[in-house]
Regions:
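Extended catalytic core of nucleotide-activated donor transferases of GT-like folds
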Residues: 220-222, 237-240, 247-347
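Nucleotide-sugar donor-binding/catalytic module of glycosyltransferases
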Residues: 1-203, 495-497, 504-505, 525
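Nucleotide-sugar-dependent
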Residues: 476-492, 504-513
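Conserved catalytic-core segment of nucleotide-activated headgroup transferases in glycan assembly
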Residues: 227, 232-245, 337, 350, ...
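A charged, aromatic-enriched C-terminal amphipathic alpha-helix characteristic of glycosyltransferases
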Residues: 531-566
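Acidic donor-binding loop of glycosyltransferase active sites
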Residues: 292, 470-484, 499
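Short acidic alpha-helix that forms the nucleotide-activated donor recognition element
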Residues: 461-473, 496
């Protein structure tokens, strides 16, 4: 057939490669061989409408500002059947991409030479460089995209939601890479045979001769990394600290059913940045890795675990409980310790130990039936680097006190009564109230159509926590007394940033004189008193920061983690790269459209 094609037109050339370099390797060779102004592709098992080239090139000839065009493609089986319920048969993906050769090669370079999803990465990199308006998406259906049974591109997608974890990891990694391109923090050019990668690539998508060896970790942090709330911020501090100590650290994605969503969310920005830098590694549930210790700070991820094994075997699993199994009155059931213990043993194949964050959580775990040795004799309150959170304070932010709080938005995270809520967060022009994390639950408690005009509310992903705390003078947290939540992380962040912290008396056992403790009726007067006396305010601000350094010294955490590692058999052998990911900084074939719509990433 190829010989017949040669006879069709003198401009047709057949280029035979001595070895199989995969689809993207072949396309990269075609980039070098092409002599025309435009490049497009057609796989051997696909079909193009006779007027496809005409329809796609016409806008490029007419509009100099356009860099590329695509058209609608129809997904079918080898027998031209539509047999994927729940997934649209039409796609506007890279299978039909046509672009200006010189502009693309000069700025973008080549396609990532892996086995799948790289054509999507190239298309999105093109948009990151040239802008959204540089691509024209034709609505006409000019390509039939056939997917063979058992092919990589077909097996890696199920319905409209499930994608292979390797493709998820790859997409999450290159999405951050593209954000850095837009911000001017990195270069978009990829050479044909890269010596160093710009972002990690999972071994599932890497050619067999370039896949990394199996990995062994010292500590794997398991959690729901799609959001960046208090428990994730806590674990990020911990994994950075352990990584700086030379330990091999991995992260494992496990969704919690408490915060399920049909929206596809990528790995949150701070964690993905650590992965892209190579500070930590992303563990794929489809690969087999081992770790001396698996550390979990959100037990709810174990309450209803996925039936698929996580791919990590451990010597010891530590479940750090940052909150009680339920609210004090039995409502807001979060997890059942015995069920979580059984799930952890089945998933990771290792003994399990529970470690409370503080004495209140210890008491709740004991009431649930846990005891030593299953319940550790020490607490693990977490760590914070005061240098990262320090905010220079010489006075007040405004003429009126700025009072704020950051936490998850739930009914138990706010005072139960309208009167109490307004005592703590007044509806008054003499106080500026700011909230990070949303206030829909507060609005429901108030029963009003809108929040007070002196309230400024940010969604959780709208601003990073440090920038939010920079705005505040006072950090005040009052909730439903039945909540029973430790809230250590948020309090530590507020103290480390120099806010004067005001809490209910139940927190005094944990934070001592680092904070002020008041009844709700005393909060407004306390705020006004400290705002009138600058020296009094600054003294309490400095005291809070000093106590954070004293009471939450990172060396204590390192010592306790070392104790846990001693209880397990340490990972042995040289520092191997993770089995799931070929990291950034190493060199690196093939399917087309990954069928993933653009979705969001938690940033704060």
């Amino acid at each position: 057939m190829l010989e017949q094609c040669l006879a069709l037109d003198e401009r047709v050339r057949v280029i035979r490669l001595p070895v199989n370099v995969g689809t993207y390797g072949a396309r990269n060779r075609a980039f070098d061989e092409a002599t025309g102004d435009f490049i497009t592709f057609l796989d051997s098992d696909d079909w193009a409408h006779p007027r496809r080239l005409e329809k796609q090139v016409q806008p490029l000839l007419s509009e100099d500002s356009l860099v590329a065009t695509t058209c609608q493609a129809l997904r079918v089986t080898e027998m031209l059947e539509l047999t994927e319920p729940g997934r649209s048969p039409f796609t506007l993906g890279p299978a039909s991409l046509m672009f200006r050769k010189d502009a693309a090669l000069a700025r973008l370079g080549y396609i990532d030479p892996i086995r799948g999803s790289a054509d999507n990465e190239y298309l999105r990199r093109m948009i990151a460089v040239f802008g959204d308006n540089s691509l024209l998406r034709l609505r006409e259906r000019l390509v039939v995209y056939r997917q063979r049974r058992g092919s990589l591109s077909r097996a890696d997608f199920r319905g409209s939601l499930w994608i292979h974890p390797a493709r998820y990891a790859y997409r999450s990694a290159y999405t951050l890479y593209h954000e850095d391109i837009r911000a001017g923090r990195t270069e978009p050019y990829l050479p044909k045979n890269p010596v160093h990668r710009q972002f990690p690539a999972p071994s599932h998508l890497v050619r067999a001769d370039r896949a990394p060896a199996s990995a062994e970790y010292d500590v794997v942090f398991a959690g729901d990394w799609r959001r960046f709330h208090g428990v994730q911020r806590e674990m990020v501090e911990e994994m950075q600290m352990l990584s700086r100590q030379g330990l091999r650290v991995g992260v494992l994605q496990m969704a919690t059913f408490r915060w399920m969503t049909s929206e596809r969310l990528w790995v949150c920005l701070p964690v993905q940045r650590l992965i892209n830098r190579g500070s930590v590694s992303y563990c794929l549930s489809t690969d087999q890795t081992s770790s001396a210790l698996v550390l979990i700070r959100d037990p709810s991820i174990l309450q209803f675990p996925r039936h698929q094994p996580p791919g990590v075997t451990a010597k010891l699993t530590a479940i750090v409980a940052s909150e009680a199994p339920s609210a004090l009155d039995g409502s807001d059931s979060r997890y059942v310790p015995q069920a979580c213990t059984a799930a952890a043993r089945e998933l990771f194949g290792a003994p399990t130990v529970w470690i409370p964050q503080d004495q209140k959580v210890r008491h709740a775990l004991e009431m649930s039936g846990l005891s030593q040795p299953e319940l550790a004799s020490f607490e693990l309150p977490g760590v914070i680097d005061p240098r990262e959170w320090r905010v220079e304070r010489t006075g007040f932010r405004a003429d009126v006190p700025v009072v704020g709080r950051h936490s998850r938005d739930s009914s138990t995270a706010w005072p139960r009564e309208r009167e109490t809520l307004f005592q703590v967060y007044p509806d008054s022009s003499d106080t500026d109230i700011r909230v990070l994390g949303g206030a829909r639950s507060a609005l429901e408690i108030l029963g009003d159509a809108a929040l007070p005009s002196n309230w400024l509310v940010y969604d959780y992903d709208e601003i990073d926590v440090r920038s939010f705390l920079y705005q505040l003078d006072f950090w005040v947290y009052f909730s439903d007394p039945a909540e029973g939540e430790a809230l250590n992380r948020e309090v530590l962040e507020a103290l480390a940033s120099g806010c004067v912290v005001i809490l209910p008396h139940r927190f005094e056992e944990t934070f001592g004189d680092a904070a002020l403790y008041r009844h709700p009726t005393e909060v407004k007067e306390t705020v006004q008193t400290y705002h009138r006396q600058r020296a009094l305010f600054l003294a309490q601000s400095r005291r809070g920061r000093a106590r954070v350094i004293e009471l939450f010294d990172p060396s204590t955490y390192l010592k306790q983690t070392s104790t846990l590692l001693e209880r397990s058999s340490p990972a042995t052998g040289p520092q191997n790269e993770p089995a799931g990911v070929l990291p950034a900084g190493t060199g690196s074939q093939t399917s087309s459209e990954d069928g993933i719509e653009e979705r969001s990433r938690s940033r704060t």
